[in-house]
Amino acid sequence: MIEELRSKNIIQCGEFKLKSGDTSNIYINLKNIISYPDLHLKLCNEIANKIIPNIDLICGTPYGAVPFASYISITNNIPMIFLRKEQKDYGTNKLIEGEFIKGQKVILIEDVITTGNSVIEAAKKLEENGLIVSQIITVFSRSKDLNLMYNDISIEYLYHINDI
């Protein structure tokens, strides 16, 4: 999979500034996976194979993980919600799009993590709205900590930067 992602320039080498402010010689641009349905399908299936039983909803972090969550939602019949980066200030003023009931169990999908701060922030927003984050999976982890946690939940990953 790593070589396939490299061949499509989803994994790039060079000098890059990351969202965390760190610099890296490797950049993982999973937002471009939507242009390669075959690779997208493979990664979605890898994520789906890790989903624990009794999940009520799937949510992808904005915006990189939304295509993953959408595909998995449709193919695995798991209702999806969409977490906005910022709450709307018009219309319904929603932070979360899609139907949900407080107390439902959510799997949160992320594309790439470095510190884990973005996915933890997303998990907190879901919980503030009455949802229970039961599982967190990221496609790639850049974290130096191989055992990132949120509350008592291990942040699982398909691939680690060390695999590249």
Q: What positions do the PLM features span?
A:
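Active-site-facing substrate-recognition patch
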Residues: 1-53
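Short, well-ordered alpha-helices that flank and scaffold nucleotide-derived cofactor binding pockets
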Residues: 49, 70, 74, 124, ...
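Short glycine-rich phosphate-binding loop at a beta-alpha junction
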Residues: 54-62, 138
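Structural detector of well-ordered beta-strand residues that form the stable sheet scaffold
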Residues: 58-59, 81, 134, 156
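A contiguous pocket-lining binding segment that forms or flanks enzyme active sites
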Residues: 101-132
